[in-house]
Amino acid sequence: MVFRIASSPYTHNQRQTSRIMLLVLLAAVPGIAAQLWFFGWGTLVQILLASVSALLAEALVLKLRKQSVAATLKDNSALLTGLLLAVSIPPLAPWWMVVLGTVFAVIIAKQLYGGLGQNPFNPAMIGYVVLLISFPVQMTSWLPPHEIAVNIPGFIDAIQVIFSGHITSGGDMNTLRLGIDGISQATPLDTFKTSVRAGHSVEQIMQYPIYSGMLAGVGWQWVNLAWLAGGVWLLWQKAIRWHIPLSFLVTLALCATLGWLFSPETLAAPQIHLLSGATMLGAFFILTDPVTASTTNRGRLIFGALAGLLVWLIRSFGGYPDGVAFAVLLANITVPLIDYYTRPRVYGHRKG
């Protein structure tokens, strides 16, 4: 008889994968609602497109591999992949982008490795990075939050822009991106990085409409707080563990605080890092992916801290305003090494 050797813990929660995935999907509702409120109906359209694309792509591969389609689709992992990608891209990005990114995520980043449980990288973030590198202009074309927008697209407008690039009134994406100051708007992180490189002072930057006296940007801080609320609910439901989110956020806050204290005129304050971009989405919904994260408690703390450090480094010194996706994938690479050195020692065995 052959016994499989595994590191502790040896007892596991018996809740099915589909139930865990469903809890994560439900926890995403506050974040989705906040994005709909501040950025319009495009987010919902992207979610629908990504969900359908993810299910069809997964079904196709399962059929080709002669595996059970119905049983696998019921685990809800494909839906979660599509959802995470859809909420990460601009709400009015062309329809083919979210389809392409989702199909790539499901087929190449997940099924090519053998399906759920075998993929070393987070599929949604692989799809996001592929789109960001291939189509940087479209992937950074975020709408201004409703409070500072000149043109607020309705549901029909959102569908028209996503599928044709224009709306009935004759406007296009460039028109919809105009803020109250008549300038095309960007995210708070993008605005900060671009303005610092242009020689503007932090005091000037914080007067821009995208900040308008808010801690971390109009709309964006509420979106992050909504994702935080969903994440806290996941912790309460014991669907995720606290180690990764806590170490990630503490490390990011610590690095941002130290950087800001040493260079307040070129580096963003900690509240901007914590409440802008995909910080809370990454902390609770992406980094906590049980397949691609570390499996030991010490390893989870190291994994989260590494991701937090990478996010700060990329945002502060890299070429991209929000480094969550890249940080997640780089941290994924280190998981086997982290797990190797943080495995619990077998009782009775000496170290060395």
Curated annotation (Swiss-Prot):
The modification FMN phosphoryl threonine is found at residue 187. It is a multi-pass membrane protein. The keyword Cell inner membrane applies. Pfam families: NQR2_RnfD_RnfE. Keywords: Cell inner membrane, Cell membrane, Electron transport, Flavoprotein, FMN, Membrane, Phosphoprotein, Translocase, Transmembrane, Transmembrane helix, Transport. The chain crosses the membrane at residues 20-40, 42-62, 78-109, 123-143, 148-168, 215-235, 242-262, 267-287, 301-321, 322-342. PANTHER family: ELECTRON TRANSPORT COMPLEX PROTEIN RNFD, ION-TRANSLOCATING OXIDOREDUCTASE COMPLEX SUBUNIT D. Belongs to the NqrB/RnfD family. This is Ion-translocating oxidoreductase complex subunit D. It comes from Escherichia coli (strain SMS-3-5 / SECEC). The lineage of its organism: Bacteria, Pseudomonadati, Pseudomonadota, Gammaproteobacteria, Enterobacterales.
